[in-house]
Regions:
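Short, charge/polar-rich alpha-helical segments
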Residues: 1-24
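Intrinsically disordered, low-complexity coil/linker segments enriched for acidic/polar
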Residues: 9-12, 38-40, 95
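Non-transmembrane amphipathic alpha-helical segments
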Residues: 16-19, 23-33, 52, 59
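Charged, low-complexity interaction regions
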Residues: 31-42
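Short, non-transmembrane alpha-helical segments in secretory-pathway proteins
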Residues: 44-60
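Amphipathic, interaction-prone secondary-structure segments
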Residues: 65-93
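A short, surface-exposed interaction/processing loop segment used at functional sites
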Residues: 97-106
Length: 106
């Protein structure tokens, strides 16, 4: 059975994915400084991680969605809608007719 998603849901998912990517990048920037927390850059990057985590959590609550997993190789995202508990798997694929990337429900 193919589940239909509203365009707003896909837009919300894109926002949530960008915030998750921001959080991932902030954590990667902090990684080299974890061994030496006395370095001033550690405080700067740990604050960026805290802000990114807060923004991501707020967006999850506001949008009512939670990303379960994201596979960079296949561009496949598994997420749930918190209100209904429905789980969706979407994949970003290239449409051969329009030559644009589109989200397809799996």
């Amino acid at each position: 059975m193919l589940k239909q998603l509203k365009l707003g849901t896909i837009n919300d998912l894109a926002i949530l994915l960008s915030l998750r990517q921001e959080l991932t990048m902030a954590k990667q920037n902090l990684q080299p400084y974890k061994r030496y927390p006395q370095i001033p850059d550690y405080a700067k990057y740990s604050k960026l991680v805290a802000v990114a985590e807060e923004r991501y959590e707020m967006a999850q609550k506001k949008l009512g969605m939670e990303i379960i997993s994201f596979d960079f190789r296949t561009n496949e995202v598994k997420f749930t809608i918190m209100n209904t508990g429905e789980m969706f798997v979407v994949r970003k694929v290239l449409n051969g007719l329009t030559n644009k990337f589109e989200w397809m429900v799996m």
